[in-house]
Every structure is written in structure tokens, then in C-alpha cells.
Amino acid sequence: MAKVHVFDHPLIQHKLSYIREESTGTKEFRELVDEVGMLMAYEVTRDLELDDVQIKTPVTEMTAKRLSGKKIAVVPILRAGLGMTEGVLKMIPAARVGHIGLYRDPETLQPVEYFAKMPQDIEERDFIVVDPMLATGGSAIEAINSLKKRGAVKIRFMCLVAAPEGVEALQKAHPDVDIYIAGLDEKLNDHGYIVPGLGDAGDRLFGTK
């Protein structure tokens, strides 16, 4: 079963409180999501493999550690996932970026893929899928389905807030995908919104309604 990592780091929790705050404006909201994305990336990549390399300092030669040849890709779920992407790239600037676009079918209420663009050598990459919210889990599950169909093997999912229902659904659908969460919330309400949540992340990021 996939591991669920809920971050209690003081900086993450401090910034998340302002992200949740209704009065936080678009500019500050965007900056905070970027910052938390960067802080979370530090923890999400904690188990990346390192290789020994020989380097020369101004004083002497030594054996140092560098990331192994495994390639990393960040995949935001459009559109809200874009808000977390730059923060991750600040920590891993060499990472490639894929995109997955999903919309909800008005009749079935199921997510439908309308766009997907991935880096080459997909089988050789570690993927970090990012989306600010994990509510029912439908979008995350479909995005990961899309990656696996294209050959992805190692996938992690990273979000700001999650409902227990979404975590359970994602674990059931993809027990091999670890889940990284800044805030695990109480529940979904009758309309499928995370409670207490942070509102509509996409609208708050881009100043739309």
C-alpha cells in the first residue's frame, strides 16, 4: 500500500494557514502556493538516489554526492497544478515538465482527459504529479492512469490539502503511488468540496470566478 506523508513542518503549516485564509489576495495566494510547493519538493525528493562523484575543491580532491542519472519530471494537473510547478522547479531546475488537462463530464461527473504532453523517455523518469487539492480523488486517479498507460513506473502525488475520501480512493486505485500532503482535512461536504479546504485553487491562483 502507498505511503501517505502529511507534513507538519512549521514553515509549511504557517504558509498553508495564509493560503486557506479567505482574505488572502491573488498575488499573495500565488506566491504562497509557489513557496509551499518548493518546501514540499524538498521533502518529496528525500529518497532520491545519489551517486558518488569525484570532484576537486579549491583545497583537495574528494568524493561527493550527486543525483543519479534517473530523470525527474513534474506533471501539473491543469490548471491549478501550474501554481505548484514553479516551486518544485526551483528545487529541481533540471526537471522536465509534462501537462495533463482534465475536465469533468457533466453527465457522468467523471474526469475526462482533453490534453496530455509528456517528456521523452517516460519509462526512465521519476514523476511528481502536482495538484493543490485531492478531493474525491478522481482527477488524480485519471492523471496517474494516463501516465501509466504511457509507460510511467515511478510516480508520486503531491497536493496542498486532501480529504480522507480522496486519499482512500487514490490508495485503492494506485497502491504503488506515495501521497504527499501539506494538510489532511476533515471531510468532503455534500457538494464534494474539501472541508475546511481553501476554496477553488484555480480561481484563487488566476483571479477568475
UniProtKB/Swiss-Prot annotation:
Keywords: Allosteric enzyme, Glycosyltransferase, GTP-binding, Magnesium, Nucleotide-binding, Transferase
Pfam family, any one: UPRTase
Domain of life: Bacteria
Binding sites annotated in the UniProt record for uracil: 194, 199-201
GO function terms (MF aspect): GTP binding; magnesium ion binding; uracil phosphoribosyltransferase activity
Gene3D superfamilies: 3.40.50.2020
Cofactor: Mg(2+)
Cofactor note: Binds 1 Mg(2+) ion per subunit. The magnesium is bound as Mg-PRPP.
Pathway where this protein functions: Pyrimidine metabolism; UMP biosynthesis via salvage pathway; UMP from uracil: step 1/1
Residues annotated as binding 5-phospho-alpha-D-ribose 1-diphosphate: 79, 104, 131-139, 200
Record EC number: 2.4.2.9
Keyword Magnesium in annotation: yes
Keyword Magnesium appears in the UniProt entry: yes
Single GO biological process annotation from the record: UMP salvage
Reaction catalysed by this enzyme: UMP + diphosphate = 5-phospho-alpha-D-ribose 1-diphosphate + uracil
Family the UniProt entry places it in: Belongs to the UPRTase family.
PANTHER family linked: ADENINE PHOSPHORIBOSYLTRANSFERASE (PTHR32315), URACIL PHOSPHORIBOSYLTRANSFERASE, CHLOROPLASTIC (PTHR32315:SF4)
Protein function: Catalyzes the conversion of uracil and 5-phospho-alpha-D-ribose 1-diphosphate (PRPP) to UMP and diphosphate.
Protein name: Uracil phosphoribosyltransferase
Organism expressing this protein natively: Macrococcus caseolyticus (strain JCSC5402) (Macrococcoides caseolyticum)
